[in-house]
Design a protein with these regions (language model features):
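Gly/Ser-rich "nucleophile elbow"/oxyanion-hole loop immediately N-terminal to the catalytic nucleophile
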Residues: 131-134, 187-239, 256, 537-609
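Alpha/beta-hydrolase
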Residues: 140-143, 172-174, 262, 495-496, ...
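Primarily recognizes the serine-hydrolase "nucleophile elbow" in alpha/beta-hydrolase
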Residues: 218-288, 589-661
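Alpha-helical scaffolding within the catalytic cores
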Residues: 244, 282-298, 331, 662-667
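Bacterial N-terminal signal peptides
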Residues: 7-16
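Short beta-strand element of the alpha/beta-hydrolase
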Residues: 126-128, 134-144, 488-497
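Alpha/beta-hydrolase-fold serine-hydrolase catalytic core, especially in secreted/extracellular enzymes
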Residues: 21-121, 300, 307-492, 498-516, ...
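Short amphipathic alpha-helix adjacent to the substrate-entry channel of hydrolases
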Residues: 153-170, 503-519
């Protein structure tokens, strides 16, 4: 009784003495920096660089050909088409004729529409000679991040000049381009075909990269089946995102004889060095377990020309940075087959990120050479066709990436929770093991707690640490308690989506109640995030300069914060899950706190959906570690991510592959028992927020 009275006296004394100044005092303590974004980014880069999938040793031609075949199958089945219905993968091409544009200049344009998956159509344009006999080589041209134009001028120039050299050219309209541009800001969920919306497909258990791959492969299927096309002389090319489509398809589908990707894909090491090279989310399918160096090696011995800019105003992945990984390391694979002359690298001397005349002429030369056509050095002038003429009829209820993801989520059915106690215990244990597998949980203990700052004044004691875990990654933490509080009892771990510096008012309220607190910034939150304050973009000077150069660059970069890019790399090449890493840090920090202090019970207090879900995962993995979880500003279901929607830029760790397919929050609550959950009113959808 005397202990309780003393505690109450100390708490009252601190509260009364500090009064209105308490929040400011706590705010100053919580704003004490523990690590700069550059430090966090360095740790992540080191962590990832140690996990870049190794490029296989070439060996001999027969062995490498067999290895290449096996790797293609594994990449398609285990990663790209993960969760896909077999009927969607194997369905034949479904193209419809939408009319012919007769130019009267020796070529015509056949307008087409085609179905990617049931209910999801896009357009295509086949350039072909007006009169032709026999079979000719054909090239599929992939569009980059173009958005507005139905068919970019540079692709029209390419197509006409390919035809005048004796080739057919099929242009495929990409997601969020041309008639698939769904309006709104390019990188917001209101624009339902924005590529980052593919993250909802991953969350629902169906690889988004499979959608992009299938859209590309359907074009190849169509070309290969045309009676006037030579199936042994098929090519692929594209700029930027079109280059990514070129390498992913041509590496994994051996029907592509010759390929010319232009400025748009990079080795993982390059992506880690300069995170502007990571690409959009489709570039990084979860559990890919292969580097783009391997995809380039899978092209051997087929003819391949890599084109990059010596300088590039849009990408930091320029020729000097990409050549060592994607050309120099790959040349030995061509040497196996004595086909070194089939593998070329061209550095465009002009500072452009375009399929400009320099790059187009290189592609004309390369395809003509390897398709056995006479060389033509000059480019032919082209009349550009306008969007109105190129328009095709697409279904009024055509699917979008976001709507497809929502449809997939709506079809998810999970195992019911058993009603009898014995079966329920078995179910709980089984689901906990499944959770460990889905979030790829690996225990992490604190290797060293680096003391950063401390204070003891105004009736408050505080100690701030950088918690270094055994895997080399860090969290930031501040321990607070009223001066003179009695030993023992419980402590509360406070998590806040925006970082602990935003929790000052709530922390003050808890301290006034006499609570002992550990406020924590887990990986990717607060000052344990690589994102810069005031700008969610990377730290390199060149990227900041790019953002200053024009509005398009700024918009593109702002929506690609390092936290999202590194989350993508962790899932794709490192076979990690950010949510698993964060849950492991929370469990590790809790264990460290119990070991270093006299507390005998731990609670968690969260604000925001990110902190809520990470805490629920941690409690479900270690149900005996925490007594109570108090949730503020959270949600009742992960379906909220789809319906609101919440973007991957807002909550990168929540978009882990299969997470929603296997679990919702009601199941996590049961698995976390005996941890008690106390949840206040859920957060309203951000779209309706005032």
């Amino acid at each position: 009784m005397r202990r309780r009275a003393l505690t109450a006296i100390f708490v009252f004394a601190w509260s009364a003495a500090a009064g209105a100044q308490t929040v400011q005092q706590v705010q100053e303590i919580l704003e004490e920096p523990t690590q700069a974004p550059e430090v966090v980014e360095y740790q992540l880069r080191q962590y990832l660089m140690n996990r870049v999938p190794a490029l296989p040793t070439p060996g001999d031609p027969k062995r490498w050909s067999q290895t290449a075949h096996e790797r293609r199958q594994r990449l398609l089945e285990d990663s790209i088409f993960h969760g896909w219905p077999r009927s969607w993968i194997d369905s034949p091409p479904n193209f419809t004729d939408q009319g012919i544009i007769v130019t009267g200049k020796g070529y015509q344009i056949q307008k087409l529409s085609y179905e990617i998956v049931p209910g999801f159509w896009t357009s295509a344009f086949l350039y072909e000679p007006e009169h032709m006999t026999g079979r000719a080589p054909a090239i599929v041209i992939f569009e980059g991040h173009n958005q507005r134009a139905f068919l970019p001028e540079e692709q029209q120039r390419l197509s006409v000049n390919y035809v005048r050299r004796g080739m057919l050219a099929l242009n495929l309209v990409w997601f969020n381009c041309g008639q698939l541009f769904t309006g709104g800001e390019p990188y917001t969920p209101e624009n339902e075909n924005a590529h980052w919306n593919g993250s909802y497909m991953n969350l629902a258990g169906t690889s988004a990269t499979g959608l992009f791959y299938l859209a590309a492969r359907k074009g190849l299927d169509y070309l290969a089946g045309l009676p006037n096309v030579d199936p042994h002389r098929l090519g692929a090319t594209g700029l930027s995102g079109g280059a990514w489509q070129t390498i992913i398809l041509s590496a994994l589908d051996e029907r592509v004889t010759a390929a010319v990707p232009v400025s748009g894909y990079f080795a993982f090491a390059s992506a880690i060095e300069r995170n502007g090279d990571v690409g959009d989310m489709e570039y990084n399918p979860p559990d890919f377990d292969a580097d783009y160096t391997l995809l380039t090696a899978l092209r051997a011995p087929r003819p391949t020309l890599l084109i990059y800019g010596s300088e590039d105003p849009f990408y930091v992945g320029r020729a000097p940075f990409t050549k060592p990984y994607l050309y120099d390391q790959i040349l030995p694979f061509y040497h196996l087959y004595h086909k070194e002359d089939f593998f070329e690298f061209h550095a465009n001397p002009h500072p452009v990120h375009r399929y400009d005349e320099e790059n187009r002429k290189e592609s004309y030369r390369f395809f003509s050479q390897h398709f056995g056509l006479p060389p033509v050095s000059e480019e032919i002038a082209v009349d550009v066709i306008n969007d109105q003429t190129l328009s095709v009829n697409l279904p009024t209820d055509n699917l979008t990436i976001l709507r497809l993801a929502r449809n997939l989520a709506d079809k998810i059915k999970r195992e019911a929770v058993p009603s009898d106690a014995s079966s329920r215990d078995q179910w709980t244990q089984s689901r906990r093991q499944k959770l460990e597998h889905v979030v790829l949980y690996h225990p992490q203990h604190v290797k060293h707690a680096w003391g950063v700052a401390n204070s003891k004044n105004g009736g408050l004691e505080a100690e701030t640490y950088r918690l270094e875990f055994v895997n080399g990654l860090s969290a930031s933490a501040t321990w607070l308690q009223p001066t003179g509080v009695q030993p023992g009892g419980s402590a509360t771990i406070v998590l806040q989506d925006e970082g602990r510096s935003h929790a000052a008012q709530h922390v003050t309220d808890l301290l006034r109640r006499g609570e002992k607190l550990l406020t924590v910034d887990l990986l990717f939150t607060g000052d344990a995030s690589p994102d810069r304050k005031g700008s969610p973009r990377a730290n390199e000077h060149v990227l900041i300069k790019m953002a200053e150069e024009n509005e398009h660059n700024r918009e593109w970069l702002v929506n690609r914060p390092p936290s999202v890019l590194y989350t993508q790399l962790l899932e794709s090449m490192a076979r990690e899950r950010s949510i698993g890493l964060e849950a492991a840090q929370l469990i590790g920090a809790a264990s460290w706190l119990k070991d270093r202090s006299d507390v005998n019970e731990l609670n968690i207090d969260t604000y925001g959906i990110r902190s809520q879900v990470v805490a629920m995962v941690a409690a479900a993995l270690k149900p005996d570690l925490f007594r109570q979880l108090t949730i503020r500003g959270g949600t009742n279901s992960l379906k909220y991510l789809f319906s609101c929607p919440i973007t991957i830029q807002e909550a990168p760790e929540l978009f882990s592959r299969d997470f929603y397919k296997e679990f919702d929050l009601d199941q996590l609550k049961i698995i976390a028992s005996p941890t008690r959950l106390d949840q206040s009113e859920p957060r309203p959808c951000r779209i309706t927020d005032p």
